[in-house]
């Protein structure tokens, strides 16, 4: 099983824009407690505890899938192909999001992303 945050919008730019603040708040809160210890540094080695990653770093490390339904589906498909993924838990709610946004993200994932994954 894998847990990954998602932000699905009609365009990559809009998804990035709507994910940034919530992502940054999430990591300001949890980064100091070592939650980022799974991130890899530029040297290919795990980073030390306390990293507060940028949205770009999280996207590069694929801890959050951001983009259009097609782009998010490509990220899920990559995990499935690389890891033989059978179960995926999505984290559809970023700090500051209203409840309705989480519901929207779950609905979009099921109706727009899942059908694109083989």
Regions found by a protein language model. Give the residues of each.
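Flexible loop residues that form catalytic
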Residues: 93
